[in-house]
Amino acid sequence: RLKELIDYGTDFDRRADGSFDLVKEGGHSDKRILHYKDSTGNEIERALVAKVKSFASVDFFTHYFAVDLITQHHLGEKVTKDTPNKKCFGAYVLNLKTQKVETFLGKTTMLATGGIGQVYQSTTNPKIATGDGIAMAYRAKGFVQGMEFIQFHPTALYNPGKKPSFLISEAVRGHGGILKNQDGSTFMEKYDARLSLAPRDIVARAIDSEMKRQGTVHVFLDTRHIPKEEILQHFPMIYAHCLKELGIDMSEEMIPVVPAQHYLCGGIIVDEFSRTNIQHLYAAGECSHTGLHGANRLASNSLLEAIVYAHRAFEKSVEEFGTQGMPSNIPDWNDEGTRNPEELVLVTEMAKELESIMSNYVGIVRTDRRLKRAYDRLELIYIEHEELYKQSKITVPLCELRNMINVAYLIIKHARAQRENKGLHYNLDLIS
């Protein structure tokens, strides 16, 4: 799959002799990671999009928003999580230009909707990361697992009010960056022998502990000992962003950093071919749960997972394409009796409250009491939102909040059920 990406034009960094410039990141034991400067994901996406656009047979539908998956439920059948032979026939999709919900039928449906970062106040995820695919699959009675395993990246740029948070890549620490307190002292030696290159959960908890102990709002990442030419060569985007946003020259000044929600290790359960428990429905990328990352993903492994499982999904879907029949009586979306929402401020305020609940009670460090409080407060938001949703015509903010509520509920539910501290789940009440 990597050779395929290279053949598509992905420009991974190379050394002077032409060999690939492999780097080491947190939790890894060796230099094994291909990269493109400090924006590998963007480079892979650029190459893939260009390749897909070269096929005249592929249609792109931009400015659309998926609302719900179509299953037997929409044919009037009762569907539960225990219903055998559940099937997906496509999705109801909101056309943002016409504001009408359209019916997209498909013999194969793939969910590749990314993460859930927007349920937290501080996240490196884009604004669209509202857990849409996970929520849709959950409502369609798909199986979801591991939602308690939320990865917080230890080093997001401390820049209050900015969302999404800007990521200071793991590779900066891999290249020699050192975490320090505000007095300039190092602290990772108190937590792990691997120091600043320990796995993300350990580093994030260490930073959280130091901030609470000292009453500070961030720590520092020190790169002043790295030659400026190396910084400019390997981290041009990070250097430019720090300089533009905060006026910090990272070759001369330390970078203020703070943990931010970054990745979800759980999601929609899939098999080795990315198949869900709903026939003809696949999921790949961060919205899926392959089990590959266990309870704590290692840096950059998600890109490998995505390209491998997406390809396997493609192969299996082609193989099974002819087995899906399409019912003739699938109804169009029915919004009779609804009206345009007049109080969008309610949606905005509910979203803010949800983010606050998740950040304060379901963050890096948890307790049973915090989780119960989060559950109780989220239930009130759910009741209020459901009433508004049933009365209103579909809008993106309304749907995104619905998805965020579903996802937040799953995170809290799974966190309360998890009675062992492992990986990214850390509950103070479980310390023996």
Positions of predicted regions on the chain:
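Glycine- and aromatic-enriched mobile tails/lids
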Residues: E4, T10-K31, K180-S196, I207-E210, ...
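An anion/pyrophosphate-binding glycine-rich loop and adjacent beta-alpha core
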Residues: M136, G142-D249, E253, I307, ...
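A short alpha-helix-loop-beta-strand transition element characteristic
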Residues: L2-G18, D59, F143-G146, V217, ...
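Flavin (primarily FAD) binding-site architecture
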Residues: T113-T123
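Conserved redox-cofactor binding core of oxidoreductases
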Residues: D7-K100, L105, A112, A156-N159
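Thiamine diphosphate
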Residues: N125-Y138, V144
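FAD-site-proximal beta/loop scaffold in flavoenzymes
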Residues: D68-T98, T103, I248-T290
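Redox-cofactor binding/interface segments in oxidoreductases and associated redox assembly factors
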Residues: L111-A112, A283
